[in-house]
Amino acid sequence: MAFALRFFTCLVLTVCIVASVDAAISCGTVAGSLAPCATYLSKGGLVPPSCCAGVKTLNSMAKTTPDRQQACRCIQSTAKSISGLNPSLASGLPGKCGVSIPYPISMSTNCNNIK
């Protein structure tokens, strides 16, 4: 009986771990959410409400460590496609949208270290 309980516990933990790894956010979702931010990130001015909506959506989706790490990688990848991106505007964007994230928005952020 004890063996069966341990086996069941290990099985449940394995399913939970696999489910969280598979839950990573896609880069397409990140790029789509941040698309309304492109002009602001390169030219400044007022942050469009649709940009902040995307930032807030991404923040609410990135609940697990794999999700946050994937979101970080996708943000870095998406940032490379924004012509004339201003790194200062990018790093300050979450705060401008009233969002607190547990890592800096920067091309030098090591996404593997994000928890």
UniProtKB/Swiss-Prot annotation:
Signal peptide residue numbers: 1-23
Query: What UniProt keywords are attached to this protein's entry?
Result: Disulfide bond, Lipid-binding, Signal, Transport
**Entry annotated with the keyword Disulfide bond:** yes
Q: Which GO terms describe its cellular component?
A: apoplast
Please name every pair of cysteines joined by a disulfide bond in this record. Answer: 27-74, 37-51, 52-97, 72-111
Could you tell me which InterPro entries the record lists for this protein?
Bifun_inhib/LTP/seed_sf, Bifunc_inhib/LTP/seed_store, Plant_nsLTP
What's a single GO MF annotation on this record? Answer: lipid binding
Q: Which PROSITE patterns does the record match to this protein? A: PLANT_LTP
Name the protein family. Answer: Belongs to the plant LTP family.
Function in brief = Plant non-specific lipid-transfer proteins transfer phospholipids as well as galactolipids across membranes. May play a role in wax or cutin deposition in the cell walls of expanding epidermal cells and certain secretory tissues.
| Protein name, per record | Non-specific lipid-transfer protein 3
The species this protein belongs to is: Arabidopsis thaliana (Mouse-ear cress)
Gene name of the encoded protein: LTP3
